[in-house]
C-alpha cells in the first residue's frame, strides 16, 4: 500500500511534470503492451497462411467472433478496473475486493456463454459467409477451440486489469509478453510438426492465453497486496454487476460495432468482388497489419486519458489543452508512418501472409488505397480518448457507429457492386478512406461542442 506522501507525489506528477515528458512517461508502457497485443493478433494468421490461402480465409472469417469475445472480456474488465481504483482511492478495501470477485464471476459466465457458442454456433457462423467446404470445416475447428477454451482469455484479461487497477502495470506486460512468446513458439509446432493446421493454431493461442492467465493469478496472489479475493463466501451482487456494466457496456458496444462491420464486410467481399475469398484474405491481412498502427495509438490514449482527466479536475486549462494537442500530433505521427509503410511496401507486408501472385494482384492496390485512410484515423482515435477523459464516451460511440455502420458498410456495398459490374475490385477499398473522413468530421464537430461547453468556460491559468 502506498503511503500518503507517495500518493501526493503521484498526484503532483500529473499536475506539474512537463506535459510532453508526462505523456511519454504514462503512455510508453501502454504502447508496448498494445504492441504485444497486436503481435497476438497477427501471429496465427502468419503461420496459418503458410499452410494455404484457404486456411487463412478460415481464420479471417473467424475474426469477428473472436474479436467480440475479446470485446466482452476487455469491456467487463474496464468496468471492474475503474470501480476498484475508485474504491481503493476511497480507502474502501472491502468494496474493492467484492467488485474484483464479481468481475471474476462475470468472466466465468462470459466464458461459458462463448463455450456454448463455440460448440453450437461455430459452423453456422462460418457457413453464413462461404459455401467452400474446406473453409467451413477449418473455420469451425478454429472457432470451436478458441471459444471452447475462452476461459483463458477472459480470466487473463480480468486478472491483468486487477493488477492495473492497483497500479501494477509492469506485471501485466510480463503476462502478455509470456503469453505471446508461448503462442509464437507453439504455433509452428502444432501447425507443422503435429500437422494440425488451423486447429493447431487455435490450440497454440489458447495455451498462451491460459499460461498468461495462470501467471496473472500468481502475480495477484503474491504481488498485489491491495486486493484479497475469497470465493468461499462469495455471492454474486446485482448492484456491483450493474455498476460494472454501466461503465463497461460502452467499451463492449464499440468492439461489437467493429465485429458487425467486419462480418458484413467479409460477406460483401465474397459476394461482390472478383477475388471473393482472396479479397477476404487481403482484408484480413490489412486488419492484422493495421493493429500495429492503431494499437500504439490506443496505448497513447490509455496514458493520455488520466492526464487530461486529472488536470480537468484540477482546473488546469493550459495543461489540458497542451495534452490534447500533443496527443493528436503523436497519433497523427503514428498514422503517417502507417500510411507510408502501406503505400510504399504493400508487397513486403503481404509477404508476411505468404501471399500468392493472385492475392498480391488484389492486395497491392488495396493497401495503397487504404493507406489514405490513415491520414484521418490518427486524429479520430486521439479525439476518442479526449472524449473519454471528460466522461463523454457517447461522442466516441457516435463517431464509431457512423464510421463503421452508417458510412463504411453501405459505401463498400455500393462500390463493390459497381466495381463488379465494370470488372474493377479496387473501388471497394476506397470505402475506408471515405468512412474515416466522415468519422473525422463528426469527431471534430463533437470536440467543438465539448470545447465550448466544458473547456472554454474554465478560467485561464499560467501553468505549464
Each language-model region and where it sits:
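Helix-terminus/linker motif at the lipid-water interface of multi-pass membrane proteins
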Residues: 35, 39-57, 126-133, 189-196, ...
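Short alpha-helical transmembrane segments in multi-pass integral membrane proteins
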Residues: 1-27, 84-151, 195-249, 308-373, ...
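Hydrophobic transmembrane alpha-helices of multi-pass small-molecule transporters
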Residues: 68-71, 183-187, 213-217, 292-295, ...
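Short runs within selected transmembrane alpha-helices of multi-pass transporters and secretion channels
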Residues: 77, 145-164, 172-180, 201-214, ...
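Interfacial/gating helices of multi-pass transporter permease domains
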Residues: 25, 47-67, 134-138, 198, ...
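Small-residue-rich hydrophobic transmembrane alpha-helices
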Residues: 56-116, 153-172, 282-344, 377-399, ...
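N-terminal transmembrane alpha-helices
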Residues: 14-46, 50-51, 67-79, 83, ...
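Transmembrane helical elements of multi-pass membrane transporters/channels
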Residues: 25-44, 145, 156, 179, ...
Amino acid at each position: 500500500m502506498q503511503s500518503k506522501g507517495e500518493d501526493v507525489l503521484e498526484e503532483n506528477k500529473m499536475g506539474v511534470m512537463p506535459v510532453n515528458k508526462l505523456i511519454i512517461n504514462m503512455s510508453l508502457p501502454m504502447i508496448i503492451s498494445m504492441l504485444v497485443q497486436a503481435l497476438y493478433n497477427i501471429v496465427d494468421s502468419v503461420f496459418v497462411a503458410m499452410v494455404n490461402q484457404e486456411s487463412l480465409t478460415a481464420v479471417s472469417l473467424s475474426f469477428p467472433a473472436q474479436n467480440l469475445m475479446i470485446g466482452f472480456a476487455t469491456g467487463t474488465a474496464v468496468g471492474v478496473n475503474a470501480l476498484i481504483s475508485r474504491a481503493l482511492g476511497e480507502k474502501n478495501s472491502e468494496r474493492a475486493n467484492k467488485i474484483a470477485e464479481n468481475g471474476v464471476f462475470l468472466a466465468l459466465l462470459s466464458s461459458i456463454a462463448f463455450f456454448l457458442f463455440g460448440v453450437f454456433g461455430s459452423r453456422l457462423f462460418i457457413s453464413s459467409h462461404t459455401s467452400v467446404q474446406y473453409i467451413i470445416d477449418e473455420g469451425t475447428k478454429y472457432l470451436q477451440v478458441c471459444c471452447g477454451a475462452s476461459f483463458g482469455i477472459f480470466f487473463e484479461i480480468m486478472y491483468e486489469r486487477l493488477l492495473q487497477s492497483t497500479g501494477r502495470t509492469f506485471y501485466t506486460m510480463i503476462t502478455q509478453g509470456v503469453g505471446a512468446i508461448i503462442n509464437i513458439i507453439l504455433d509452428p509446432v502444432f501447425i507443422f510438426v503435429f500437422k494440425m493446421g488451423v486447429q493447431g493454431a487455435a490450440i497454440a493461442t489458447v495455451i498462451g492465453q491460459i499460461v498468461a492467465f495462470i501467471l496473472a493469478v500468481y502475480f495477484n496472489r503474491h504481488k498485489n497486496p491491495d486486493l484479497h479475493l475469497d470465493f468461499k463466501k462469495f455471492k454474486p451482487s446485482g448492484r456491483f454487476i450493474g455498476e460494472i456494466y454501466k461503465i463497461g457496456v460502452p467499451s463492449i458496444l464499440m468492439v461489437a460495432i467493429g465485429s458487425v462491420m467486419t462480418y458484413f464486410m467479409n460477406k460483401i467481399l465474397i459476394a461482390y468482388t472478383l477475388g471473393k475469398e482472396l479479397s477476404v484474405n487481403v482484408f484480413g491481412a490489412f486488419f492484422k497489419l493495421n493493429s500495429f498502427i492503431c494499437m500504439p495509438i490506443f496505448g497513447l490514449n490509455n496514458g493520455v486519458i488520466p492526464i487530461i482527466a486529472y488536470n480537468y479536475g484540477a482546473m488546469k486549462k493550459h495543461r489540458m489543452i497542451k495534452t490534447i494537442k500533443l496527443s493528436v500530433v503523436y497519433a497523427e505521427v503514428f498514422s503517417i508512418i502507417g500510411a507510408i509503410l502501406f503505400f510504399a511496401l504493400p508487397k513486403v507486408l503481404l509477404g508476411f501472409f505468404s501471399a500468392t501472385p493472385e492475392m498480391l494482384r488484389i492486395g497491392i492496390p488495396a493497401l495503397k488505397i487504404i493507406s489514405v485512410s490513415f491520414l484521418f484515423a490518427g486524429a479520430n482515435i486521439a479525439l476518442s480518448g479526449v472524449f473519454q477523459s471528460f466522461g463523454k464516451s457517447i461522442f466516441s460511440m457516435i463517431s464509431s457507429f457512423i464510421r463503421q455502420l452508417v458510412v463504411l458498410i453501405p459505401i463498400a456495398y455500393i462500390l463493390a457492386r459497381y466495381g463488379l459490374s465494370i470488372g474493377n475490385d479496387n473501388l471497394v477499398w476506397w470505402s475506408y478512406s471515405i468512412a474515416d473522413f466522415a468519422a473525422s468530421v463528426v469527431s471534430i464537430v463533437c470536440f467543438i461542442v465539448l470545447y465550448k461547453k466544458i473547456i472554454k468556460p474554465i478560467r485561464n491559468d499560467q501553468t505549464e
